[in-house]
Curated annotation (Swiss-Prot):
UniProt-listed PANTHER family: RIBOSOMAL PROTEIN S15, BACTERIAL AND ORGANELLAR, SMALL RIBOSOMAL SUBUNIT PROTEIN US15M
Disulfide bonds: none
Annotated organism of origin: Hordeum vulgare (Barley)
A single Gene Ontology CC term: ribosome
Keywords linked to the UniProt accession: Chloroplast, Plastid, Ribonucleoprotein, Ribosomal protein
Name assigned to this protein: Small ribosomal subunit protein uS15c
Subcellular localization, as worded in the UniProt entry: Plastid, Chloroplast
One Pfam family named in its UniProt record: Ribosomal_S15
UniProt-listed GO biological process terms: translation
Lineage of source species: Eukaryota, Viridiplantae, Streptophyta, Embryophyta, Tracheophyta
Oligomer status and interactors: Part of the 30S ribosomal subunit.
InterPro entries, alphabetized: Ribosomal_uS15 (IPR000589), Ribosomal_uS15_bac-type (IPR005290), uS15_NS1_RNA-bd_sf (IPR009068)
Family: Belongs to the universal ribosomal protein uS15 family.
Molecular function as annotated in GO: structural constituent of ribosome
Amino acid sequence: MKKKGGRKILGFMVKEEKEENRGSVEFQVFSFTNKIRRLASHLELHKKDFSSERGLRRLLGKRRRLLAYLAKKNRVRYKKLIGQLNIREQ
């Protein structure tokens, strides 16, 4: 992982980000995953921040629904994406 502006960014998505459509399911899942990881690290420090915890749950649900859609439409792209992002399969 590379650091850019204080944030960790996955190297394989940085170069693809410029070429790929930002509205694609893969890009949206990647974006949600970055936000989820940032919120999770925030909640480790601030355990009583319940509004951020609620936001984290909402993001997890959105990502789960997008992954379910991708798994239904194109299983190969789904497997590749979860492998690259290092997240569990549903």
